Amino acid sequence: MMQMMEFSFSSPAFFLLLPFLFLLIKPLISRKRGPKLPPGPKKLPIVGNLFHMEGALPHLALKKMTDKYGPICHLKLGELEAVVVSSAELAKEVLNTHAVTFADRPETNVSKIVMYNNSGMTFARYGDYFKLLRQIYASELLSPRCVRSSTNHMEDELSKFVVKIQAEAGKPIFLLERVKSYLFAVLFDSMIGGACKCPERYIEAAKELSANSAAMRLEDFFPSVTLLPKLSGFNTVLAKLKKKIDDLLDDLISEREKIQANATGPMEEHMLDVLLKLRNGSGSETKVPITNEDVKAVVFELMLSNLSTAATEEWAMSEMMRSPKVFKKAQDEVRRVFKGKNRICASELHNLEYLKLVIKEALRMHPPAPLLFPRKAREDCEIGGYTIPVGTMVWVNYWAVGRDPQLWHDADKFEPERFSNVPMDFNGSHSELIPFGAGRRICPGIAYGVTNLELLLSALLYHFDWELPNGKQPEEIDMDEFYGSGCIRKNPLALIPKVVIPCQA
């Protein structure tokens, strides 16, 4: 007669089944005891959600995900844990409420190889070194006092910029490259007190680095696979670019050191002089040493910031050309404020109330970095009711915040008037308008960049009328984007200038 098999803790069958029972129960235990992560798409083995990032515009890909899963979304990108937030409320939690927790940066091959092992304020890990750089920027390089002292240089270079455009009146020109030349000329004035040799070499190097810094690359998502960047050839590309940048910056520094050595009396101090003084240990009580590589990293990240300013100027002109009423209103204001003058002067910029609204609206719709530079959690933290584990990479999709219909009426329309009588600025306290970031890692060059934007747009509106080439209509201007280290126009804006109020340099 058959007997029923009995399972007991001594039964061999129990021990055979035990591993299978553990495999069945483990996910339930993990789900119960593990952290409450934000929702997100299903993860594939090894690659996780990398396939969701396909396409040239990551801010749009991530916007689709948060539209589906909510304003906070968890991703697995290769070996990395990542979270994307796309609401003003959650951006404030990440950048302001938990500013110190999310003050760190993830490391990339670009930041490690080209930017001197994560040197400079943009890529530095959070700590004493970062705090020192922030202090240097705030008090020595880009303080309001430093910006005010630079306005004479800005005005002089602006007049030269206008005269060059006057010489090309009546034919189509691409504004972007001319704006970059102006911005680099102003930077070199502030950096060394005058022009440098072959400034176009620095512009090209900055553009090349920007093109190789498109968000994060596949190699960054698998940091343990050290052969990957070698096999892809990306390390070779970066090494060549690093040498090019190194040679340029070494030339700039050595030339400045020669001038300092040959000076027979007191010299006017410029940005590079301040950095070299800190490198040499003069005038600094900090315990954190400033090396020659730190100096080069700071100088080059200042150059990179010029590309963002130039892109914003082009977006602003594009939007105004698409909106003739906005263009005329801004132009009428500029010509009223500067009436009778033959050049733009910074002392009158505070009177350009409508132009300031135009710039805010341009930065809302076209932020320099649609995905704010990623942060890295320094410890476990709760955001929006979910756990963000230590080491997680966090992106704030400001492009999504700037186009959020719950925050902005008719969010895809260029409407500067939406900021009228609204006390909202770029200092990071208004999470609806944070194109320059917020919290501990807010961009230190806001005043410098915005002043240049106001001067550039004022000059273009004051001295010239503008037409589209080949009879193109305003609504035909394409607004396609290209993503590098920031977001620029895919196709450069071509316009025809007509001189109305001549300028003499």
Curated annotation (Swiss-Prot):
It is found in: Membrane. It is a single-pass membrane protein. GO terms for biological process: alkaloid biosynthetic process. GO terms for molecular function: heme binding; iron ion binding; monooxygenase activity; oxidoreductase activity, acting on paired donors, with incorporation or reduction of molecular oxygen. Its main location: membrane. InterPro entries: Cyt_P450, Cyt_P450_CS, Cyt_P450_E_grp-I, Cyt_P450_sf. Keywords: Heme, Iron, Membrane, Metal-binding, Monooxygenase, Oxidoreductase, Transmembrane, Transmembrane helix. Heme binds at C443. Pathway: Alkaloid biosynthesis. Belongs to the cytochrome P450 family. This is Geissoschizine oxidase. The lineage of its organism: Eukaryota, Viridiplantae, Streptophyta, Embryophyta, Tracheophyta.
